[in-house]
């Protein structure tokens, strides 16, 4: 018998430090292009740039206001977009130092306190350009300080302060691009995102021979803009103020500094003679391609034929959101269609694909970033705006080509319109056949609520036990109802070939099922059969 060492069998692959390679953080320095730092590792330079970029002196003076010897704003929330969150820690430290705020643990005892407290909000529930009232209400905030680009829409409840920042621009390069793109006979509107707006007057001064109209920031009732003074009066349009009484925008060329998001860009291209965007980083201009308006006209017709409308709430902070939501619900009901309301945070393809019964989506969101413009058919169902939906539900479909996203304008145009209904809803014979103008097919489910009086809801046994309690959907005469109301989701589930686990067998099959047998035992390396 040999004395060789017995080696136990290896149960897994040998591993050491060289088996796997992990990514390691080589540097903790944060890239802050917006600050134009000469030495990114110099803490003093970073602090000085942050004070100047965000106008912290004016912000601290505003936050330090008092009423009756007490702070006016005690629970302050700071909202940062993703590209500015790197400055949040420094800003909070400076605010705490200047306002004598003592850092506290994130515990709310509910007791009244005369001291100020500061929270940081990041990863907003909806569009980053909107004030996140939902997150602010979690700590019962009485003031939201919004940093970075903002849509400046009227907000619903809370007081807000906008700190847009002071980015730099190569003014001479922009003036050169404008002179190259336009002649002195053309009328030009200068517009930009909110942070770059303070530089527009300087650009206009270098173009004395041009007919230039500047788009200033508007004055809002529940918010203040730090480092910027909006004009008191003017013609308000596109969330901007123009220093004139009336403007025929169709006669103006638009030169926009920075490239807007698709909803904003579509809105601008439908109102100006032409649109040219300028990229401050690369210094290049673009004249297209831009979102197509003809596709929106197709979606209006699809909204007219849709039987089930999903109302997708993509904001809860804008003013008139609840009023518009109630108006849309009433118009959908008057048109004989079914609606469902969804609040899913930030929408994406996977979230909306879970609701197959929805024929079309109507999104309530900010006109800058909160509206989904599906240019590549990424989503399974069309997505329309409230204006497009109400236009499709109206009795006479007449579109002038304008694209309206402002809540107030939509309510003024369609809020008082009454959708006509048949005098006798009990007779289907008077209803004309409906054909889809896109596909040409006959549509029998465009108005499911018109059939509500024909429902014959019956039960297999009154007061007894249902033999088919494993079925989610009960079949009725012509439709499906849940709690006395038509459910198009249940109808859709009923018409599917496969309706879920447990529905793929009938009474004729063996209810006892198969016998349970012993399976394999052991580990994955070797099973005992």
Swiss-Prot record:
Cofactor note: Binds 1 [4Fe-4S] cluster per subunit. The cluster facilitates the reduction of the catalytic iron-sulfur cluster in the DPH1 subunit.
Signal peptide from the UniProt entry: none
Pathway as given in its UniProt record: Protein modification; peptidyl-diphthamide biosynthesis
Subcellular location as annotated: Cytoplasm
Binding site for [4Fe-4S] cluster: 130, 151, 366
Similarity remark: Belongs to the DPH1/DPH2 family. DPH2 subfamily.
Coiled coil: none
GO cellular component, as recorded: 2-(3-amino-3-carboxypropyl)histidine synthase complex; cytoplasm
Function: Required for the first step of diphthamide biosynthesis, a post-translational modification of histidine which occurs in elongation factor 2. DPH1 and DPH2 transfer a 3-amino-3-carboxypropyl (ACP) group from S-adenosyl-L-methionine (SAM) to a histidine residue, the reaction is assisted by a reduction system comprising DPH3 and a NADH-dependent reductase, predominantly CBR1. Facilitates the reduction of the catalytic iron-sulfur cluster found in the DPH1 subunit.
Domain of life, per lineage: Eukaryota
Keywords assigned by UniProt, alphabetized: Cytoplasm, Iron, Iron-sulfur, Metal-binding
Cofactors (names): [4Fe-4S] cluster
GO biological process, one term: protein histidyl modification to diphthamide
Record Gene3D superfamilies: Diphthamide synthesis DPH1/DPH2 domain 1, Diphthamide synthesis DPH1/DPH2 domain 3
Family matches, as PANTHER family: 2-(3-AMINO-3-CARBOXYPROPYL)HISTIDINE SYNTHASE SUBUNIT 2, DIPHTHAMIDE BIOSYNTHESIS PROTEIN
Assembly description: Component of the 2-(3-amino-3-carboxypropyl)histidine synthase complex composed of DPH1, DPH2, DPH3 and a NADH-dependent reductase, predominantly CBR1.
One of the Pfam families matching this protein, by short name: Diphthamide_syn
Molecular function (Gene Ontology), one example: metal ion binding
Name by which UniProt lists this protein: 2-(3-amino-3-carboxypropyl)histidine synthase subunit 2-2
């Amino acid at each position: 018998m040999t004395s060789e060492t017995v080696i136990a069998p290896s149960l897994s692959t040998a591993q050491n430090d060289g088996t796997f390679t992990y990514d390691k953080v080589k540097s903790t320095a944060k890239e802050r292009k917006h600050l134009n730092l000469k030495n990114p590792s110099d803490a003093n330079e970073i602090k000085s740039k942050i004070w100047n970029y965000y106008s912290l002196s004016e912000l601290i003076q505003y936050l330090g206001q008092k009423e009756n010897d007490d702070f006016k704003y005690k629970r302050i929330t700071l909202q940062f977009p993703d590209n500015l969150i790197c400055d949040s820690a420094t800003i909070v430290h400076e605010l705490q130092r200047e306002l004598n705020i003592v850092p506290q643990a994130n515990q709310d005892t509910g007791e009244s306190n005369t001291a100020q407290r500061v929270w940081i909000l990041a990863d907003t529930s909806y569009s980053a350009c909107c004030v996140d009232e939902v997150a602010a209400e979690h700590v019962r905030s009485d003031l939201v300080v919004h940093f970075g680009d903002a849509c400046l829409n009227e907000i619903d409840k809370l007081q807000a302060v906008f700190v847009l920042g002071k980015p730099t621009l190569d003014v001479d390069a922009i003036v050169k691009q404008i002179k190259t793109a336009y002649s002195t006979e053309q009328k030009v509107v200068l517009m930009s995102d909110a942070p770059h707006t303070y530089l527009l007057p300087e650009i206009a001064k270098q173009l004395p021979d041009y007919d230039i109209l500047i788009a200033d920031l508007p004055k809002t009732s529940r918010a203040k803009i730090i480092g910027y003074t909006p004009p008191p009066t003017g013609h308000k349009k596109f969330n901007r103020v123009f220093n004139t009484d009336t403007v025929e925008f169709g006669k103006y060329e638009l030169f926009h500094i920075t490239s807007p998001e698709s909803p904003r860009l579509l809105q601008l291209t439908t109102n100006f003679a032409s649109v040219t965007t300028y990229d401050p980083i690369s210094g290049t201009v673009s004249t297209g391609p831009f979102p197509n308006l003809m596709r929106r006209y197709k979606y209006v017709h699809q909204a007219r034929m849709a039987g089930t409308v999903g109302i997708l709430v993509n904001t809860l902070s804008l003013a008139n959101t609840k009023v518009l939501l109630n108006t849309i619900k009433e118009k959908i009901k008057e048109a004989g269609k079914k609606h469902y309301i969804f609040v899913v945070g930030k929408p994406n393809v996977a979230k909306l694909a879970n609701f197959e019964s929805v024929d079309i989506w109507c999104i309530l969101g900010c006109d800058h970033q909160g509206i989904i413009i599906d240019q590549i058919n990424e989503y399974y169902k069309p997505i329309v705006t409230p204006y497009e939906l109400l236009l499709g539900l109206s009795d006479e479909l007449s579109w002038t080509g304008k694209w309206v996203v402002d809540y107030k304008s939509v309510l003024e145009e369609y809020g008082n319109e009454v959708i006509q209904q048949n005098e006798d809803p009990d007779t289907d014979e008077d209803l004309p056949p409906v054909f889809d103008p896109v596909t040409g097919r006959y549509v029998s489910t465009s108005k499911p609520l018109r059939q509500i009086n024909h429902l014959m809801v019956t039960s297999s046994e009154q007061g007894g036990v249902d033999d088919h309690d494993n079925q989610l959907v009960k079949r009725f005469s012509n439709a499906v109802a849940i709690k006395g109301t038509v459910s198009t989701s249940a109808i859709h589930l009923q018409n599917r070939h496969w309706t879920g686990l447990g529905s793929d067998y009938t009474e004729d099959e063996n209810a006892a099922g198969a016998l349970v047998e012993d399976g394999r035992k052991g580990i994955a390396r070797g099973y005992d059969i």
